[in-house]
């Protein structure tokens, strides 16, 4: 039996939460019911907190729309709060996560294994545009 998109989404969100917990963060995910889908600020699936670092994150499967990226980039949060988008990238040999971090007005991109190890860092400083 084929899994629903919602169930697959929950599984991906759970995996990201586990990675943050492995890195020492406390994680709070959105509480959802069958008929009520609410994200933090209608944009983020969860938040992670460690020391003085607060991260709001969004989890996507395979593709991220430019509109979603722009919305999250432009969403006003204090400069000390990070906005991170996790994109599941299925591969033939081994699936990985692409992590897009928006810190103040800069965008950073890296790749993380399913186990939470950073595989490759690609830093793109400066404005997203």
Where are these regions (language model features)?
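Active-site-adjacent loop/helix micro-motif of nuclease/hydrolase catalytic cores
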Residues: 38, 55-74
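Hydrophobic/aromatic beta-strand patches that form the interior of the parallel beta-sheet core
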Residues: 28, 57, 84-86
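Active-site metal-binding core of divalent-cation-utilizing nuclease and nuclease-like domains
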Residues: 26-51
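Conserved catalytic cores of phosphodiester-cleaving nucleases, focusing on short active-site segments
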Residues: 20, 46-63
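Acidic-basic catalytic patches of nuclease active cores, encompassing PD-(D/E)XK
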Residues: 1-34
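Domain-level recognition of nuclease-like catalytic cores that cleave nucleotide substrates
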Residues: 7, 68-69, 77-129
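A generic structural signal for well-ordered alpha-helical segments
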Residues: 20-21, 76-78
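Surface-exposed substrate-engagement region within the catalytic domains
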Residues: 28, 74-77
């Amino acid at each position: 039996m084929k899994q629903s998109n919602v169930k697959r989404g929950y599984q991906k969100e759970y995996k990201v939460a586990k990675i943050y917990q492995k890195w020492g963060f406390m994680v709070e995910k959105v509480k959802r019911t069958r008929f009520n889908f609410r994200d933090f600020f209608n944009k983020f699936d969860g938040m992670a907190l460690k020391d003085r670092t607060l991260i709001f994150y969004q989890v996507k499967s395979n593709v991220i729309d430019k509109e979603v990226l722009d919305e999250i980039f432009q969403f006003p949060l204090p400069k000390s709060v990070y906005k991170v988008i996790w994109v599941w990238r299925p591969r033939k040999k081994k699936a990985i996560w692409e992590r897009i971090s928006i810190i103040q007005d800069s965008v950073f991109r890296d790749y993380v294994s399913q186990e939470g190890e950073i595989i490759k860092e690609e830093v793109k400083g400066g404005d997203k545009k």
